[in-house]
Amino acid sequence: DAREWGFYRGRREANNVTMAVKPGNARGDLTATHVTWKHQRMVPEVPSPLLLNGILYTVKTGGIFTAMLAATGEIKKSARMTGALDAYYSSPIAADGKLFLCGEQGKVAVLKPGAEWELLQVNDFEEPIYATPAAAGGRLYIRTASTLFAIGAEAAR
């Protein structure tokens, strides 16, 4: 139908970007005056980026994980996460000194953060994950299609 065609046409023509914009009171087209840097490649379709210690992290479908300097946009490392080549709808999260990324097919990649990030391990929850994990009270909460997992130290009584 026409609505479906419009959706797919718009998706094909989408011009997704990751960019840094200077804050201020400007109005109108700020491209020439307030955009510090811009990338049109390696841009995620759904997940939000994660900013941690001056490094902006993004994950793209196919398990492509990118670390760039937030101040300049310089890409420090962009590579596929072996064992976690998946579609990503949830956003990366930082907890317990690590980065966690949940893929649609249930793979959870655990990474050492930094400009030259390192894939530490991949865990398979064996069912879809669409939600971004949450961290609270020393635990990581991961929601799969049928279960909410609480991972971490047992609470003191």
Listing of model-derived features with the role each one plays in the protein:
Residues 1-157:
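Noncatalytic, solvent-exposed loop/strand surfaces
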